[in-house]
């Protein structure tokens, strides 16, 4: 028995040493916050495992959502409640005409709980690009090489900012959420996102294929750092969060120690309350304006929520815009969706003047018209209460 224990201990030591020698030591942090907690991969409640975050302070003029006339009366049906529970829903919020229609929490969450956005924040990074466009710092029709010179050679030279916004860069980052050695795991858990990006270049003519990858969002964040001082958290804090009257601080996970120049993980790890996530939906609903004040260039927001196939004839993708998912209901109502790994979503439905937020620990795998079928069910649940 002693020899078996000794051999096991030696093997463990060798594995640890190898992980550090090959720059895969990030795996141990990932294992600690996923497998050792009984999850296959990252979860919405992983904030305690973030060693470095930037704070986005609550607004100095907080604007709570007012109760609408149906608030407290509008409830999901028993069947809908069962469905929400089956996918481990943590919060469900419905807003119409700028007022609360329904708000509910479960699994220990409440109106003050901060949860991980995962990919919902890709849309926020796009909004930050929109801020730069409005300031004349970025032209989305320009090439990436204009801002990041390493893309000046070969086919890279034709890659545009718009193509990166639309996930059609043809840069082979990879987007596996189960491969612990893949690009996405390194981007989520390892330090040094910018170093991770450096070797990647296009491997086919840019613009000719839609491929959803967080690496594109990381490139957009790097572009922003090339054209302005400050960082993503400051962009959101000073130009959106304050003006939208956010009631709570948000936190954004960093890829290392800020003293060493760490940057936000621009594709995930934005932690906010459900009510404050809804503000991004309202901002989109009002085409980049908040209570009459234009925060993001209106034309940019209009293009952001326009399907790819209406802005280019290179790719016939109708369910994606600028870092945001798009669709329409069975009866023809267009909507946009900020959507994350665990089925978190901020849905904006202009025809109903409504915003719906759902957070949770799981989602279904089925798809319909390029989107998770859960999105359509969430919309149906919300509409039943309007």
Which residues fall in each region the model found?
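Active-site SXXK
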Residues: 98, 115-140, 164, 220-224, ...
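Active-site-proximal alpha-helical segments within enzyme catalytic domains
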Residues: 216-223, 266-289, 344-360
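Short, small/polar residue-rich loop motifs at catalytic or cofactor-binding pockets
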Residues: 86-89, 113, 341-342
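Active-site helix/loop module of the DD-peptidase/beta-lactamase fold
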Residues: 134-172, 199-201, 226-267, 272, ...
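Non-transmembrane alpha-helical segments in soluble domains
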Residues: 130, 145, 162-165, 198, ...
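Active-site Gly/Thr loop motif
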Residues: 247-255, 305-355
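N-terminal leader/targeting segments and the immediately adjacent pre-domain N-terminus
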Residues: 1-109, 135-137, 373, 378-386
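A short acidic/small-residue loop/turn micro-motif
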Residues: 106-110, 114, 362-365
